[in-house]
Amino acid sequence: MAKTKILNKNNKKEEIIDQEENEVDVKTTCKELSPPTDLEIENLEKLENSGASRLHIVLSFIKKNGIGIGTDLTHFEFASSFLLPHSTHEYYSDNMAREFDILLKSNIDNEIERLLGVFKYILSIKPIIEDSTRSPLRSVNGETKSSNFHVTIIDEQDKSEKIIKDNYYMVETLDQEKAFVGSCIYNKREGVKVHFNTETKTIFNGTNIKLPIIGNIIIRFEKFNEEYTITNPTLYGRYLRGFVEYCGETTITSKNSKYYIKKTNLAKPLIGGNVNMVEAKLLYGDDPNPLFKINGSWSNEMEIINCKTKETKLLYKRPFNYFTKIIPDILPTDSSIVWKDIIVPISKGEKINISKERSKILEYQKKLNWKISQFHLNTDNNIWEPIIYKD
């Protein structure tokens, strides 16, 4: 078991902590961390500019701020070296929309194939995160991202292509303090909708940063009056080992069908093994014996095994058929407007202090006092939905 020295949050003395122990439960009340001073941020900026390694910067950050296990970093003001020049809305919109063709092709009568389509879509929307020490800019109240996007459907038999243009997504920050976001990707004509109402925390967990995703993904196929509920795994930033991974057990259950999927996102072993590995079972009702087993890597290939016939075949393989065209609908509250003082200079190759610019933007947003404008709470199903579904 790998070990590392970190600070205990109570007495600030160094302790030896096991790699996979001392997990913090999502429901645990976490220690709130006081914001760092401008001087502390400036010192970290200097450390970054000195050419120090990323790991050295991270460990210095932990030590200087007295961060211990269970510290809530959700609203902590990070130095530039820990920030990406785009909003969290990039994850909710682009990642959830890019494989929407999988769901459109799964809008079929076969219950098992439809469920497998949902499974493939859920795996495919996970972003491959290259840097375990950087995070996007937290979105602000009322911030939006909206677009029409086109996807290409490829017929598996004759390989003919069909472009479907009437797909849309809308993302809006509903509660900045809780990092609560409403997101919907849909095709009104096809009656296919994805709702992603989630709250995200960032918790220091010793040898990793833990990001529990609180809330479910809801996928609807109105043609069949079918609704799927998908629970979310926990995201771990393994900063000492240099990668990010999803871990934990999740389920895909149906409102009407007895078919369901149990999925386990496996943690990479300390020695050997691979990251992003998944094991899953497709089951029916109370029968504990699976109909299908699914194994592989969500970032590479997944195979499916028919437990009765023992037939094994490829379920999917990355890369996929990304959306062919995006037509942004730039609202006054769009992410590109909110963060333009950060996004524009960086796109031009100019070096700026992201953390300081972010603080200025947040102060300005408080004065604007934006309200929720694009979503409303549907009290019939307790889901935040777009006020208007575009045709």
Swiss-Prot record:
InterPro entries: OSBP_sf, Oxysterol-bd. GO terms for molecular function: sterol binding. Signal peptide: none annotated. Pfam families: Oxysterol_BP (PF01237). GO terms for cellular component: cytosol; membrane. Belongs to the OSBP family. This is Oxysterol-binding protein 2. The lineage of its organism: Eukaryota, Amoebozoa, Evosea, Eumycetozoa, Dictyostelia.
